Amino acid sequence: MPSSSGVDSTQELLDAQAHIWNHIFNHINSMTLKWAVQLGIPDIIHKHDKPMTLSQLADAIPINRAKSDALHRIMRILVHSKFFDRVRTLPNEEEAYCLTRASRLLLRDEPLSLTPFALAVLDEDLMGTFHCVPEWFGNECPSPLEFKHEKSIREFAENNQRWSLLFNEGMANDARLVGSILAKESRKVFEGLETMVDVGGGTGMVSKAIVDAFPGMKGIVLDLPYVVSGLKGSGNLRYVGGDMFHSVPPADAVFLKWILHNWSDDECIKILEKCKEAITTSKNMKGGKVIIVDMILGYEKQQDEAVETQLFFDMMMMTTLTGKERTEQEWAKIFFAAGFKTYKIYPLLGLRSLIEVFP
C-alpha cells in the first residue's frame, strides 16, 4: 500500500495530493474572473436580455471562432464558480448562459459594481508582489510591494493613473453599499449625533448617505488635501484637507471605514489617539465615540469561504501596506492602548463589522 509521512492509506495520500493541486491552481479562479470582466461577458449577457448560447456569446464578444472551445471551457469553470448559470428551455435546445447574483455585481453600470475593484486587485504589477515575499522577509522594506517596486502604495497609485482610477471607483462603489446599509440597518448608532467626522472619507459617499438619513447631523469629511481639493460641500456636509496623524476636527463621533486595517498597530494607536482627542474636545463634554467599519477575524462562526476571504484580505494588507486584519482581541488591544475603555460590535456588514468604541 502506498504511504508517505503522516499518510496511512491510499485514499488519504490521494486526498492530500488533490488538496495540494487545488491550491497550486487556485489562482485560476481569480484569472478566469478577470478574463470574464475584461471580455465584458456579464454586460454582454445582460444587454442580450435573455440567456445566451455559446455561439451567440462568441459572436458578441467577438472572438476568433477557432477559439470557441476555449471560451466554452472558461465558461464551464465560471459556471462551477457560480458566476453564471446554464439553462435549457427545450430538451433539444442548445444550453445558454445567464447571470447570477454574483455576476450582476460585475456589471459596469451597476452602482455597486465590483469590477473596478477586481481589476485593481488582480493588476499584473500588484500581483507580482506576492512572488517577492520570501525575499522580503530578509530585508527592511515595510511591504513586499515596496520591496519589488521601490515605492509605497501611494507612489504606486500616483505613477499608475489607470490603476488609481480603478481602485478609487471600486472604493466609491463599496462606499455606496456600506452607506446605504448603515443608513437603514444601524440607525441607533447614529441617532442623536450632531456632528460626525469621516476620516479618510474620500469623496464622502458614506457621509452623504448618513447625513441624508439624519438631517440634523452635520458631517465633515477629512482626507488629504489633494483628495478633497475641488470637492464642494453642501448645507450639512463639508470637506477638510488634513492629516489624521496630526489632528482630527472636533465632533460627537469619528467614523473610520476600512482605514485602520491599512496601518500597523502602532500607527492605529496614533490615529485612535487623535480620534479620542476629537470626540472629547467636542461640545459633547461626556465624550462621544469612534465608529469603525472593518473586519474582525474569527468573530462568530462563519462559513469556510468567509473565513478564507478574510484571511486573503489579511495577506493583501501584508503584501501592499503595513496593515493587517485583526481578531477581536487584537482590536481590543489597540483600543485600550489608545485610551478607550469599552467597545460594542455589530456584525451587520457581511465579512465586516461595525464597532463602536467609547472613551
Curated annotation (Swiss-Prot):
Tissue specificity statement from the Swiss-Prot or TrEMBL entry: Expressed in leaves and trichomes, especially in cv. SD and cv. EMX-1, but barely in cv. MC and cv. SW.
Entry keyword annotation includes Cell division: no
Molecular function GO labels: O-methyltransferase activity; protein dimerization activity
Pfam families in the record: Dimerisation (PF08100), Methyltransf_2 (PF00891)
Gene Ontology BP term (one): methylation
Record entry for activity regulation: Strongly inhibited by gardenin B (GARD B).
Domain of life of the organism encoding this protein: Eukaryota
Binding locations of S-adenosyl-L-methionine: 223
Keywords: Methyltransferase, S-adenosyl-L-methionine, Transferase
Practical use: Nevadensin is a selective inhibitor of human carboxylesterase 1 (hCE-1), a key enzyme responsible for the hydrolysis of a wide range of endogenous and xenobiotic esters.
Reactions performed catalytically: an 8-hydroxyflavone + S-adenosyl-L-methionine = an 8-methoxyflavone + S-adenosyl-L-homocysteine + H(+); 4',7,8-trihydroxyflavone + S-adenosyl-L-methionine = 4',7-dihydroxy-8-methoxyflavone + S-adenosyl-L-homocysteine + H(+); 7,8-dihydroxyflavone + S-adenosyl-L-methionine = 7-hydroxy-8-methoxyflavone + S-adenosyl-L-homocysteine + H(+); 3',4',7,8-tetrahydroxyflavone + S-adenosyl-L-methionine = 3',4,7-trihydroxy-8-methoxyflavone + S-adenosyl-L-homocysteine + H(+)
Residue numbers annotated as active site: 261 (proton acceptor)
Pathway connected to this protein: Flavonoid metabolism
Keyword NADP (UniProt): no
Entry's family note: Belongs to the class I-like SAM-binding methyltransferase superfamily. Cation-independent O-methyltransferase family.
Protein task: Cation-independent flavonoid 8-O-methyltransferase involved in the biosynthesis of polymethoxylated flavonoids natural products such as nevadensin and salvigenin, aroma compounds which contribute to the flavor of sweet basil, and exhibit pharmacological activities such as anti-allergic, anti-oxidant, antibacterial, anti-proliferative, and anti-inflammatory effects. Catalyzes S-adenosylmethionine-dependent regioselective 8-O-methylation of flavonoids; mediates likely the conversion of pilosin (PIL) to nevadensin (NEV) and of 8-hydroxysalvigenin (8-OH-SALV) to gardenin B (GARD B).
Name this protein carries in UniProt: Flavonoid 8-O-methyltransferase 1
Provenance organism: Ocimum basilicum (Sweet basil)
